[in-house]
Regions:
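FAD-site-proximal beta/loop scaffold in flavoenzymes
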Residues: 128-136, 244-293
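Residue-level detector of alpha-helix initiation sites
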Residues: 16-17, 44, 113, 153-155, ...
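A Rossmann-like FAD-binding core segment of flavoenzymes
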Residues: 66-90, 100, 166-256, 264-266
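Low-complexity, small/polar and acidic-rich linker and loop segments
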Residues: 395, 402-426
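Beta1-alpha1 glycine-rich phosphate/pyrophosphate-binding loop at the start
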Residues: 3-65, 149-150, 154-194, 387
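Local cysteine-cluster metal-coordination motifs and their immediate loop/turn environment
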Residues: 349-364, 377-395
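FAD-binding core/adjacent interface of flavoenzyme oxidoreductases
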Residues: 2-8, 32, 57-146, 230-236, ...
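A conserved FAD-binding loop/helix module that cradles the flavin
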Residues: 286-324
Length: 427
């Protein structure tokens, strides 16, 4: 355990577009003597969206800014948020724990994929959409592999392009949202020209791919791994042989750290004011943890929070005028890509809901709440700590997961001892 806390004027958790925009903006507008410390699990900045050094012009502009001399970066994981001060308990890859303190703390913890379990979803070869994209970017060979993408949300399209670029055989791109919902979404796109042009760019590349709407996965099957997927549009069903099925129902905000910090949560996202300030003093939340709205919104929030942390309050308020427009886009995405009821109705008694602990739907269904299910079945007690099964249990049974408790990642007993020793020294 490192004895002295690591101190910086601004402490940022996360390293995606929102975090990068906040760090770079702070570094440019704060006094040169003030330092910004960015903490992230990944070895490089960019988050999932800018993984592996995106060549996108917008991404390059912000990523280049991370080389400013008053921005420092540490790789590792945040184990806990300090209750009284803007700070966290941090563990480096070598296992060393340390207190990191800032005058202000910014949480930019992003979002994760939402899964709705279906028969066969735990078979090898069935992956999350973002998971498949990440694996392709880090070397998975899908050349000549038959790929079905079926789920919901804008993430489907960059994933499909990743499969195309990797020479995979993209058989199907199926969206579960209804035609009526998608028509309403399209009607609102002119208010977001940057998103409209992005969508047109994907459609120009994907127009040859079969892309039904109002279509979803009923089940997946195979001997030992995925061999086929059964699709339906509610009127008829059909099977397709494939090697990979990438699926997921839009994204959900990562709010565990914010909840642990005592921030107000509203509609399953962190509640913030116009400058990104949470209900807790000197603690900001930006990006997808405040609502899933894409990189442009995340960057806009990061700029506003970075200016506020740098003491440029007037300029920060001026920049925040753009945010209500993006808040409406978040609401539009949520309304369009929410899971249809049929996805919840098709689950069977033997369908696994908690894959860490191998718990089927039939064992969870009689339980009255998350805590009872946890005590009786070990729901949410595996390595993911409810990150996958928690949202599924909420959708299926209306369970509200327990208040999160540190640590947020599996730890050795020694690391756990060091974490609490660090907290006690700082309290």
């Amino acid at each position: 355990m490192s004895g002295e806390p690591k101190r910086a004027s601004l402490l940022i958790v996360g390293s995606g577009p929102a975090a990068i925009a906040a760090a770079v903006t702070f570094a440019r507008y704060a006094d040169p003597s003030e330092q910004c410390l960015v903490l992230d699990e990944m070895s490089t900045s960019g988050g999932q969206i800018w993984r592996s050094g995106s060549t996108n012009g917008l991404a390059k502009y912000w990523l280049d800014g991370m080389s400013l001399p008053n921005i420092h970066r540490k790789q590792g994981q945040v184990l806990d948020v300090l209750p009284q001060k803007p700070g966290v308990v941090f563990q480096s890859p070598n296992g060393e724990t340390q207190i990191c303190l800032g005058n202000d703390l910014v949480l930019a913890t992003g979002a994760r994929e939402r899964w709705i379990p279906f028969p066969g979803w735990t078979l090898p070869g069935v992956v999350g959409m973002g998971g498949l994209q990440a694996m392709i970017k880090t070397g998975l060979c899908v050349a000549n592999k038959r790929v079905v993408i079926a789920g919901s949300g804008p993430l489907m399209y960059p994933v499909a392009r990743s499969v195309q670029k990797a020479k995979g055989k993209l058989l199907l791109l199926a969206e579960q949202a209804s035609f009526a919902k998608l028509a309403n979404f399209t009607a609102h796109l002119p208010a977001y020209p940057e998103k409209a042009f992005e969508a047109l760019g994907y459609l120009a590349k994907l127009w040859k791919v079969s892309s039904p709407v109002g279509t979803w996965v009923q089940q997946a099957g195979g001997e030992g791994r995925l061999e086929w997927v059964q699709m339906t549009n509610g009127k008829k069903s059909w099977r397709m042989e494939c090697d990979y099925l990438a699926t997921g129902c839009h994204l959900i905000p990562n709010i565990d750290l914010a909840r642990m910090a005592g921030c107000t949560i509203e509609k399953d996202r962190v509640k913030v004011d116009s400058l990104g300030q949470t209900s807790r003093s000197h603690l900001y939340a930006i990006g997808e943890c405040t609502g899933v709205g894409g990189a442009e919104r995340a960057i806009a929030q990061g700029i506003v929070a970075g200016l506020a942390a740098a003491g440029q309050r007037e300029l920060s308020h001026h920049q925040s005028a753009a945010l209500p427009r993006w808040e409406r886009f978040v609401q539009l995405l949520d309304a369009t890509f929410s899971p249809r009821s049929e996805l919840l109705d098709q689950i069977r008694e033997d369908t696994i809901v908690c894959r860490c602990e191998d718990i089927p739907h039939g064992k969870i269904k009689p339980m009255s709440c998350w805590r009872e299910a946890k005590l009786q079945t070990r729901l949410g007690m595996g390595p993911c700590q409810g990150k996958v099964c928690g949202p599924a249990a909420k959708a299926l049974y209306g369970f509200e997961p327990d208040f999160p408790r540190p640590p947020f990642q599996p730890l050795s007993a020694q690391a756990l001892f060091q974490m609490y020793q660090s907290e006690n020294q700082e309290s």
